[in-house]
């Protein structure tokens, strides 16, 4: 049967249930146990043994085996599965007053996917299956759409993400991933709160962007008549709190960056930023080790983990090594020895490092060498320390190494997991760096930071020595759940709309008709479209964006296929 036929048949069952006086969409149900509790409580029950303990449970029917006077259902709730043992005489006797033909209605009007409540006693069948020996049942929710086939199930990865609710129903391991995510974030908060850190919420809508080099999402406030930005980091507002007298603050929340999508990047993601007065980046390294090892031990019960076939030992202390030393170790290039930019470029080209021609400083080339030749090799937890000042506009100058800053990034399985500074507290130095960033922004660098005058004013009131730390929650969850893609650990990741990309279009000037074909195969014809619109579409840098803004909903149309 097609999905449409199945849905039609189930709608008929909905009407039959209503005619029987049964509401197929119940208001509530009171359970006494979950499946896992019953499996644990009666684990020692022997085959053929019964107990008189009355239980009530609810869950989704995941399998049905129906015979003449007997039926076996597999019921699944959030914790696991248990079998329902359904015997005609027992059900008819128990439900005689409410439904004289209850057993047959159960057989005829329920389907895999329905949500059922059941009451009964406990028995273990002769085949050894712990079961609820059902006395009464209630259809709590009648499903209309069929679940994916057990063996050929939900294998389309994009569809799994797009219909996460179905993914969660049919793949218990996906539910486990999100349970662990919740345990990880709760564990991080608990660790910090036990050490007197205070979580304070900062604005998501901001009049200035800052705290990271990233392209923001832009929106508009109609009443205030001003552009606003979705935050790209929580850093600058948390630092204002340090200026204001708080000594230990953090925020775990969403940030937004209008950038690419990949297995490691989602435009909307979760991070935690932590700031501690009178601390430096060495203190932040200790804090990072403490947070991650404590959470891993609490959630997984071990510090020896496997990620995509790689064995990772999270046991502290973790390796600490400078970016210069790592680049020298993997490339042979000693960036301390280069006296000129051209010397650094020439040596780096010979070492096979791409992109050096565009680099304007030796520090930028050092970072390119690190990203190209080193990063992927850092499987075990490694603190990469002492970065070039050119790529770290918010970090304090290194106390003994000119041209460097006191910054570290934590790499695990070749992936940046945390970032930290001894924070820059000199307002004059900070202004100079932000003005340099603003100049890059004015020159067309969409990721460069602007000058946040209010933040600079705050610094001029005086910010104590401060250590700052950011941890990517999604990447940490990926690590601790052995998930290959960031989309596997975000419940509802951002996806391109189905069938929304323009494959090709044609314009007939005599009739002012614009015919558009989309990647889904759909073809639409738009009428009375001026030639100027077609010409603007031709020249638009993003044809999809132009279509949604100036064509869709603006002209009458007909769907051709």
Curated annotation (Swiss-Prot):
GO terms for cellular component: cytosol. InterPro entries: Aa-tRNA-synt_II, aa-tRNA-synth_II, aa-tRNA-synth_II/BPL/LPL, KTSC_dom, Lys-tRNA-ligase_II, Lys-tRNA-ligase_II_bac/euk, Lys-tRNA-ligase_II_N, Lys-tRNA-synth_II_C. Binds 3 Mg(2+) ions per subunit. Mg(2+) 1 binds at residues 409, 416. Mg(2+) 2 binds at residue 416. Its EC number is 6.1.1.6. Keywords: Aminoacyl-tRNA synthetase, ATP-binding, Cytoplasm, Ligase, Magnesium, Metal-binding, Nucleotide-binding, Protein biosynthesis. SUPFAM superfamilies: Class II aaRS and biotin synthetases (SSF55681), Nucleic acid-binding proteins (SSF50249). It catalyses: tRNA(Lys) + L-lysine + ATP = L-lysyl-tRNA(Lys) + AMP + diphosphate. GO terms for biological process: lysyl-tRNA aminoacylation. GO terms for molecular function: ATP binding; lysine-tRNA ligase activity; magnesium ion binding; tRNA binding. Its cofactor is Mg(2+). It is found in: Cytoplasm. It is an enzyme of class 6 (ligase). Its main location: cytoplasm. It comes from the Bacteria. Belongs to the class-II aminoacyl-tRNA synthetase family. HAMAP family: Lys_tRNA_synth_class2. Homodimer. This is Lysine--tRNA ligase. It comes from Trichormus variabilis (strain ATCC 29413 / PCC 7937) (Anabaena variabilis). The gene is lysS.
């Amino acid at each position: 049967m097609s999905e449409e036929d199945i849905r039609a048949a189930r709608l008929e069952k909905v009407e039959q249930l209503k005619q029987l006086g049964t509401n197929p969409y119940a208001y509530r149900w009171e359970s006494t146990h979950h499946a896992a509790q019953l499996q644990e409580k009666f684990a020692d029950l022997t085959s053929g043994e019964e107990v008189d303990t009355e239980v009530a449970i609810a869950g989704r029917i995941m399998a049905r085996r129906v015979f003449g006077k007997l039926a076996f259902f597999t019921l699944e709730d959030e914790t696991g599965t248990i079998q329902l043992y359904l015997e005609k005489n027992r059900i008819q006797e128990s439900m005689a007053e409410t439904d004289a033909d209850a057993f047959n209605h159960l057989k005829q009007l329920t389907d895999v996917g329905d949500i059922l409540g059941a009451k009964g006693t406990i028995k273990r069948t002769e085949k050894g299956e712990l079961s609820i020996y059902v006395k009464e049942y209630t259809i709590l929710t009648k499903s209309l759409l069929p679940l994916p086939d057990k063996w050929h199930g939900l294998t389309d990865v994009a569809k799994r993400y797009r219909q996460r609710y179905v993914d969660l129903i049919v793949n218990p391991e996906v539910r486990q991933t999100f349970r662990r995510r919740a345990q990880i974030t709760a564990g991080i908060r608990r660790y910090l709160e036990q050490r007197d850190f205070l979580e304070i919420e900062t604005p998501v809508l901001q009049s200035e962007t800052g705290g990271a080099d990233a392209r923001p999402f832009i929106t508009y406030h109609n009443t205030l008549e001003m552009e606003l930005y979705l935050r790209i980091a929580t850093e600058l507002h948390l630092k204002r709190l340090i200026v204001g007298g708080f000594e230990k603050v953090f925020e775990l929340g969403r940030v937004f960056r209008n950038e690419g999508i990949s297995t490691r990047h989602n435009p909307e993601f979760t991070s935690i930023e932590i700031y501690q007065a009178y601390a430096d980046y060495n203190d932040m390294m200790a804090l990072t080790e403490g947070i991650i090892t404590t959470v891993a031990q609490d959630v997984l019960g071990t510090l020896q983990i496997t990620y995509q076939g790689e064995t990772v030992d999270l046991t502290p202390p973790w390796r600490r090594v400078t970016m210069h030393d790592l680049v020298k170790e993997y490339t042979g290039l000693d960036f301390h020895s280069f006296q000129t930019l051209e010397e650094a470029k020439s040596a780096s080209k010979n070492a096979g490092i791409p992109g050096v021609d565009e680099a304007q400083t030796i520090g930028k080339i050092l970072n390119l060498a690190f990203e190209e030749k080193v990063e992927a090799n850092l499987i075990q937890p490694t603190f990469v320390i002492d970065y070039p000042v050119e790529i770290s506009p918010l970090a304090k100058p290194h106390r003994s190494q000119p041209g460097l800053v006191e910054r570290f990034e934590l790499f695990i399985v070749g992936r940046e997991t945390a970032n930290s500074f001894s924070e820059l507290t000199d307002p004059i130095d900070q202004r100079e760096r932000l003005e340099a960033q603003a100049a890059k922004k004015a020159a067309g660098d969409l990721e460069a930071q602007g000058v946040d005058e209010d933040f600079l004013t705050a610094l001029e009131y005086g910010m104590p020595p401060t250590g700052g730390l950011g941890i990517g929650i999604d990447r940490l969850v990926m690590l601790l759940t052995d998930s290959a893609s960031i989309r596997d650990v975000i419940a509802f990741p951002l996806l391109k709309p189905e069938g929304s990309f323009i494959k090709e279009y044609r314009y007939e000037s005599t009739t002012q008709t614009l015919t558009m074909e989309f990647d889904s195969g759909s073809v639409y014809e738009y009428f009375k479209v001026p030639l100027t619109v077609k010409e603007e579409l031709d020249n638009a840098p993003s044809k999809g964006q132009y279509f949604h803004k100036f064509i869709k909903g603006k002209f009458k149309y007909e769907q051709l296929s």
